[in-house]
From Swiss-Prot:
Enzyme class: transferase
Gene that specifies this protein: trmB
Binding site for substrate: K149, D181, T218, K219, F220, E221
Record-given protein name: tRNA (guanine-N(7)-)-methyltransferase
Keyword field: Methyltransferase, S-adenosyl-L-methionine, Transferase, tRNA processing
Organism annotation: Pseudomonas putida (strain ATCC 700007 / DSM 6899 / JCM 31910 / BCRC 17059 / LMG 24140 / F1)
Region Disordered, residue ranges: 1-20
Length: 240
């Protein structure tokens, strides 16, 4: 999710404010009964509104605990599994795909989880408007759209500007964890993050970390394994 550098000019010669290029496409999708239940019953309890000032998440969760935010949780399987496995931590998921939000919330209701909240809007807006600086222990970005074609690379969410936004929101020592099943995108993310100031690559060899135990195996990973693809994990720690 990066900014366009083209500034449109109006007919009277004045420059219009440029629009930010989004890294996602809104997809229509039918709701299952369970997904609709999640939205109807879980939405009022667990979907957070987009705020105009930093949110006090200690108040939202009723405690102070290590906090993880995931961007683009898809259908929510991994986030649900991680939240259930770590009840002593708090999790915030951001996803614009409504069936995915419904599926996650249905799981939250079914499992009775209390340590998970959701935003159903643009993650950049959430980070800019709702998340205080130096407040996150971890930010996760698993299997983002790689935008394969060269002309679409500007739509990739991992850009220097985004890396700086994430760095501001992480606590010192906080970790930005990325994963992809497309090697050219892994190489691209490694290049961007290696050039981003204020980070340290946690990989011993300066490339990719071994598959972390805390990241559940996703459908993307299983698909990649069937196709003979690998999965690349990157972990960059905020150092200042």
């Amino acid at each position: 999710m990066t900014e366009s550098h083209d500034t449109p000019i109006t007919s009277d010669g004045e420059a219009r404010p440029h629009r930010r290029i989004k890294s996602f496409v809104m997809r229509a999708g039918r709701m299952t009964e369970g997904q609709q239940r999640g939205l109807d019953q879980g939405g009022p309890l667990y979907i957070l509104p987009l705020a105009d000032s930093p949110v006090d998440y200690d108040q939202v969760f009723g405690r102070s605990a290590p906090r993880t935010l995931e961007i683009g949780f898809g259908m929510g399987h991994s986030l649900l599994e991680m939240a259930a496995a770590a009840p002593e931590q708090d999790f915030i998921g951001v996803e614009v795909h409504r069936p995915g939000v419904g599926a996650l919330l249905n799981g939250v209701l079914t499992q009775g989880l209390k340590n998970l909240r959701v935003y159903d809007c643009d993650a950049i807006e959430v980070l800019n408007r709702c998340v205080a600086d130096n407040s996150l222990d971890r930010l996760m970005l698993f299997f983002p759209d790689p935008w394969h074609k060269a002309r679409h690379h500007k739509r990739r969410i991992v850009q220097l500007e985004f890396a700086e936004l994430v760095r501001r929101k992480l606590k010192p020592g906080g970790v930005f964890h990325m994963a992809t099943d497309w090697e050219p995108y892994a190489e691209y993310m490694l290049e961007v993050m290696s050039a981003a100031p204020g980070y340290r690559n946690r990989a011993a060899d300066g490339t990719y970390v071994p598959r972390p135990e805390e990241r559940p195996i996703t459908k993307f990973e299983r698909r990649g394994e069937r196709l003979g693809h690998g999965v690349w994990d990157l972990k960059f720690e905020k150092v200042d």
